[in-house]
Amino acid sequence: GFPAERIVFFEPHADEELMQAVRPDAIITKESGESGYFREKIEAARRMGIRIYAVVRPSLPPSFIPVGGPVGLRRAVERLVPGFFSLRSGFTTGTTATAAVVAAMHRLMGLGSLAEAPVELPSGEIVSLPIAEIREEEDAVVSAVLKDAGDDPDVTNGMAVCATIRLNPEHEEVRFLQGEGVGVVTLPGLGLEVGGPAINLVPRRMMTAEVRRLYAQGGVDITISVPEGREAATQTFNPRLGIRDGISIIGTSGVVKPFSAEAFVGAIRKQVGIATALGANHIVLNSGAKSERYVKGAYPALIPQAFVQYGNFVGESL
């Protein structure tokens, strides 16, 4: 084998010192990108006048599909091998809205129109969502992405989630405005400003980060709308949570797990939080609408928010 005394171990950011010690006539390196310190090696060799041979990374054949992590891998398998998983995964309204923001911002900055918008999930993984529509309106750009909830029984599945982006020189923030079909917060306890749009904190952070990638400073107004959201909201927990006139833009992980028990239990937690914020000292758990009507008659002094339906999750509710 190769003589052990001729092996010199690589130390990050010590390329020039290594080459000074070895004094090679040439170096051979592979195209390894940032993680392999490719650029640093090349720059150090050039400064010393050392000949460089780089093994170029081969192009992937069309049959290869790059993925950025477990979410992308699962989505690719679901697409290529239908039925491999019993239920398809999907994306939250927060991720969907963020994709619309990315596409609109890209166009607003004069960078053209995207067929798919890359979005960074809270986990750090990059996923891409197809853009359904993009257009310019005077001083704004409007983009729409269709919500894909996978096989989760989500009332928003297939609905257009739209983002309207405007630059606003009158302030320096990324500001969120209520659009058609997005609810307005009317009660405390959700961690959102009363009177503001029902856009949860994680989606706000996701959208803000994507805007600042392309527009580091200056005011930006983001209006999220869901044209069918007002009607869909009547089939959600929003009326109980004090969210009126539309749905919420939600999502903690950015991904919808099919038939997610987490979403139901999360809604129960929010209801309890609101009841507590309104000063309720007692919570009445009940199985559904019929039993709730009965217990409301038994406890007429309690506020409406003190009555919480547990569905199939009585243990989690307790």
Predicted features along the sequence, with ranges:
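Non-catalytic interface/targeting segments
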Residues: G1-P12, V67, G72-L80
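Anion (oxyanion) recognition and catalysis
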Residues: E43-R46, N157, T276
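General beta-strand structural signal in soluble alpha/beta enzymes
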Residues: F9, I28-T29, A54, F176-Q178, ...
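A C-terminal functional module that forms or caps the active site or interfaces directly
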Residues: F10-M48, I52-R57
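Active-site rim loops that border cofactor/substrate pockets in soluble metabolic enzymes
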Residues: G1-V22, R293-F313
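Generic N-terminal targeting/processing segments that precede catalytic cores or assembly contacts
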Residues: F84-L241
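Conserved active-site and cofactor/substrate-binding residues in soluble primary-metabolism enzymes
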Residues: G36-E40, G68-G72, F91-A99, D154-A160, ...
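A structural signal for small-residue-enriched, beta-sheet-centric alpha/beta enzyme cores
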Residues: R88-G94, N238-S248, T252-L318
